[in-house]
Amino acid sequence: MPPDGAVLAAGQRFDIRVEATSDTAEPPSKLTVTLSGKDITSQNILDPGTNGERGAGGTGTVDGALARLFWAGTAPPNTTNFLKRQVVLTTSGTIVIEARTADGATARVRLTVESWRALASARGGRPAKNIILLLGDGMGIAHRTAARLVSRGLTNGKANGRLAMDTLDATGMVMTASLNSAITDSSPGMSSYATGQKSNNNQEGVFPDNTANAFDNPRTEYIGEFLKRTRGAGFNVGIVTTADVTDSTPAANAVHTSDRTAGAGIADRFFEERATNGVTVLMGGGQRYFMPKEDRGERTDGRRLAPEFEQEGYTWIATRTDVQRLLAASPVPKKILGLFHQTHMAVAFDKVGAGKYSDELARPANEAYRDSPMLEDMAALALKSLSAHSPSGFYLMIEGASIDKRAHAADSERMIWDTIEFDRAVAVALAFARRTNSDQDPSNDTLVIVTADHESGGLGIIGVGNERYAPATLGKAVRDYAAVFRFTTPQELTLFPNYPLDDKGFPTDPDPSRKILLGWAGAPDHNENWVSNRIQQEQAIAQKGETTVSVANPARDGDGPDSDNKTVGGKPIPGFLVRGTIENGETACPDVTVCTADTPSVGHTISGHTASDVPLSASGPGAWQFVGVYENTDVFLKILRASTGNYRVGSDAGLTPGASARPVQPRK
């Protein structure tokens, strides 16, 4: 590692790891490693092993003998390994890493190092001082379209307005595969953007290795780490999410691990590596990993991490009221730790609809979360803090996490509401960028990117409700409610949604007579009654017998008396069974928080990701680079080029030198 074909930015730190495995109990001997013809075998940091050879027999490094960053766990005893940390290549071109053992076995990888800094003969682009990357987790084209149809509506076939994310200057399509799968999970999905490298599913900021330790894998430098190191103390990083802050997407901007579920360990590394990751603003859920069990947390080591952040100058906040207080404060704190939930934050449907069409926050277990901030408020606070304290610029990642999490539950309304909430955060970012990009100072410009890590659920917009078959009218759900274009006479129906809206674009009634109807191609068996659910429920549950399989959850849209199948007015609407297309999994989700995760090791009763390309929209310096179809890893270099003005200006700028512009080679 890195794998063959990897493209690195000139000056970007990365680790080299070589693993030689024997078919016998004895490890291979005399492993030699060369970098572009230069022997670097002596630079192996692993401890001496079999016959005194470093790395032979699976040796790691003695804990405490080297700085924690350079530590490595033990590997299988029939392996000989090489590890060199923090390699930096500054000259562009092709680099060859070759490994050989005494028996003549040879392996070779070719890497490309790409220049990204502005050339002496500048191309005319203005540099981006600040980068704001907004990621709607799992947000494919249909998710964006659904949010527009609901929050803007149609008149005479034309949209009554655009989403904020529809208004950016340039749009392209991103290919989302991970290093080991056509269908990525969120960890390598985000990590590919932030490092320029593919990772295995479940891993972020690292390449795979043969050790069990979750934090010793070979690393690649994140964009925030890179710019912090190269721009200095005046550059800062912000991470804002509606998920647990140790969840895949937020962690894949600052923490290097092969285990996306290592919650407490991930929280530790946010703190312990703050000098290099540059994170001064961290907001979302996940308080459980910052406090011990005896203090409403889940840590088993007794560590009280949140107070440690406070001791290092972070302002620790926990409510929407706290966010509003800091937004009004002058000066605003430079360092902010916002932990607004024990796990993932309350979703927009339940925050906006509390006491009206959602009962989720009325549940006693959720009493502490009734004063939860909206994502737009968190985004505004992050921008206020970072812009005030980052003379060398900042990198800010803002995630709408529960677009994905509610898509996993095939929870149409909650997914749409979270997409609308996310779009309101996009509007906050665009307003900030308009101010910096239109003033008289050419050195403070901002690049805004809106994209997704993958598509979630195989979502399709399958129709608009035909009023004559409305569930509230019939007292039951029928498939004929999903009107597409079946007409007896040309003027018989108007098939445009009719949601009443508040002043923020959220519906005041989630179940109008003509609502949009969604279908999920990547879902297990579930019931459907075309009516929103007042509480969050699993779509499928396990039924234990000789073999454990999952079935559609009768408590969600089923026909039982205890089913959450009622309209806002209280009328029960029994649903019909929708046969799923993916495996139903062997274990039930123990609670809704776990159910809406997408951990590969857990048997699913939830919808899955798909391999569909996802849209990316950009505005600001270098935005035109993002026109076209490209790998998720290409985004990293495009951002770096934008940061120095090293890009072509205008509509011809979509094709830039690099991996995305290379011709397709015939398959051998």
Where would I find each of the regions flagged by the language model?
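Short, compositionally biased P/S/T/A/G/V-rich stretches that sit at domain boundaries
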Residues: 1-12
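Aromatic/hydrophobic beta-strand junction motif of beta-rich domains
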Residues: 16-24
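A post-motif C-terminal structural segment
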Residues: 47-77, 129-130, 139-191, 200, ...
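Short, hydrophobic beta-strand segments
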Residues: 61-92, 111-114
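Low-complexity, Pro/Ser/Thr- and charge-rich linker/hinge segments at domain boundaries
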Residues: 113-131, 227
